[in-house]
Amino acid sequence: MKAVVALGANIGSPREQMDVAIALLREATEVKAVSNYYVTKPVGGPEQPDYLNAVCILESELPALDLLAVLQGIEKSLGRERDVRWGPRTIDLDLIQYGSLLSAAAELELPHPRAHERRFVLEPWFEIEPDAILLTHVKISEL
């Protein structure tokens, strides 16, 4: 199943942490494409440093919740703490879309409910998949 995963980091060594996260994703899934890294301003939350963001396209046989567990395990291994909503982080891995799966479950909403509002997701995704369609919306090039 094709999965779209957004990555972000803004404390510690963001580039190194994202490189390690991608390497760990390669161990757990088949990474098909990785965007360039983008420097972006934080959205919401407390005052904090700019983020480094990217998007990966993965191929995975894991069920969506199992893939989410892999992403959260990678975050934990890289020191992710969930103390402050939209606060600074060593790494953030968000499952944006998983095949054509639609989910409103509390533990996993798909597609990601705010992806269509987040330029730091849309621009890197467009770079590696210009014809992508965000389910429940339109082509990402039109957002």
Give the residues covered by each predicted segment.
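N-terminal beta1-alpha1 ligand-phosphate binding loop
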Residues: 1-28, 35-41
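Flexible, gly/pro- and Lys/Arg-enriched active-site loops
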Residues: 12, 35, 42-51, 62-143
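A general structural signal for well-ordered alpha-helical packing
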Residues: 18, 22, 31, 53, ...
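Extracellular and analogous surface-interaction loops
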Residues: 59
